[in-house]
Amino acid sequence: MNKKLVIVLMTAGLAQGALAAEVYNKDANKLDFYGKAVARHYISDNTAVDGDATYIRLGFKGQTQISDVLTGFGQWEYNFQANHSEGGNDAQNGNKTRLGFAGLKHATLGSIDYGRNYGIIYDVGAITDTPVIFDDETYISADNFMTGRGGGRLTWRNNDFFGLVDGLNVAAQYQGANSNSTNNPRSATRSNGDGYGFSLSYDTPWDVSILGAWATSKRTTAQNALLLGDGDRADIWATGLKYDHDSVYLAATWAQSQNMTPIGSLGYANKTDNLEVVAKYLFQNGFAPEVGYFKSKAKDLELTGDQDIMHYWDFSLVYYFNKNMSVYADYKLNRIDKDNNLGIASDDQTGLGLTYQF
């Protein structure tokens, strides 16, 4: 396996659509199509996890050259579950739009886009979102304020700080309310009030990156009525450090949140401390072992005081046949106490999979 392919594989594991196929490129318009077919099976004593987990994911990225300095762009991504019946009550479970946004990019001023996109905190969280299966990030989840994927987001990004400082990247994001008082009502634990946040990162010349992000959002009346958690705002800050050179990838993040981390349907933790560490190496023969450690401790819970709400080691091994095909196994060693009072699953999990991506 040559050095160029090693770099491609490491990048593909971290960036959605890194292997996209170009389907149209004419008259200053370009359209790339990407996706993957994931054949996957989980083994666990937890019946909510054990079994088939096969899915298909498809998306496109398009751009149009408006002028010498201005480009328009858009992206859409959808997930199709392939482990359900045809036409039964479960047929549509898990089928969902993951991303959908459009924007403009200026050569110097940066890009601005609006729609369903990743939250500003994911600028940090992405560097440890690397386990092949069990990437249950401690402080990142979809439709959870400004952390994971979510809707109604206006995002501005500028790389290399207006062309003045190589490697210095800044971003700002605003999110409008999504709740029962808007045109897209949802459950309390999927809702959010108006919020905003910022991120800053610096890629050094020595393959080391330093990252930081902060966000704050209004909480809804329904959220404050839940059993756990209380407060007008949900706040979070996160920092990260990454080393990425050829076959070696090392990353760690630390984050602290207030009134933001959900605990099932019970509500939110008043405060959490979150640590994530990953280490990965890609051998020239195509094997890529990875070890990860993830821990989230909730503080001052109304029912139980301080308690781990996520705590596990992750051990995975991937074999890349080429840049498009891989087979893998992932083991989640759960360290959550079996007798915890919040009903958090404590079972270990094993995942096996075969993925074709383009």
Tell where the protein language model's regions lie, with residue ranges.
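Transmembrane beta-barrel strands of outer-membrane/channel proteins
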Residues: G35-H41, G74-Y78, R116, A172-G176, ...
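Outer-membrane beta-barrel "beta-signal"
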Residues: L154, Y319-F321, S346-F358
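Outer membrane beta-barrel
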Residues: E22-I43, T47-A177, N192, S201-T204
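Residues that define the transmembrane beta-barrel architecture of outer-membrane proteins
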Residues: N29, V49-I56, N95-R98, G148-G152, ...
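Detector for outer-membrane/organellar transmembrane beta-barrel domains
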Residues: S191-F315
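Outer-membrane beta-barrel architecture
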Residues: G59-K61, F101-L104, T155-R157, S199-S201, ...
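Repeated loop/turn-to-beta-strand initiation elements of outer-membrane beta-barrel proteins
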Residues: I66-G72, T108-I112, F162-V170, W206-G212, ...
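Gram-negative bacterial Sec-dependent N-terminal signal peptides
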Residues: M1-A21
